[in-house]
Amino acid sequence: MNNYRNGGNDMLNITKNLEDKKLTVYLEGRLDTTTAPQLEESMKESIGDVSELIMDFEKLEYISSAGLRVLLSCQKIMSKQGSMKVIHVSDLIKEIFEVTGFIDILTIE
């Protein structure tokens, strides 16, 4: 488990579970301009040999454009080597996906 604090009370907890070539990433907290670089670095370290990526947003409270950029980067990589889906998306984050068009780019369950 990786914890990243961004100065104040805002924090992003990243927990990864790798089974065979299936990586599940659990995010808790806020994915914003401060925490997105840590997620991006964490994903670069983990995604290389993965054929299935699952992003679990059950405990994600917020996502900014910087977080969306990280998701897009992961989606581009996974479209070449396997599949990616986002699960347990809150209504607020689903609305952000709809407004930005990410609802049509990502597989959301």
Residue ranges and their predicted role:
Residues 4, 10-39:
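STAS-typified acidic loop motif
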Residues 33-105:
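Amphipathic alpha-helical interaction surfaces in cytosolic regulatory modules
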Residues 5-6, 96:
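Intrinsically disordered, low-complexity repeat segments enriched in small/polar residues
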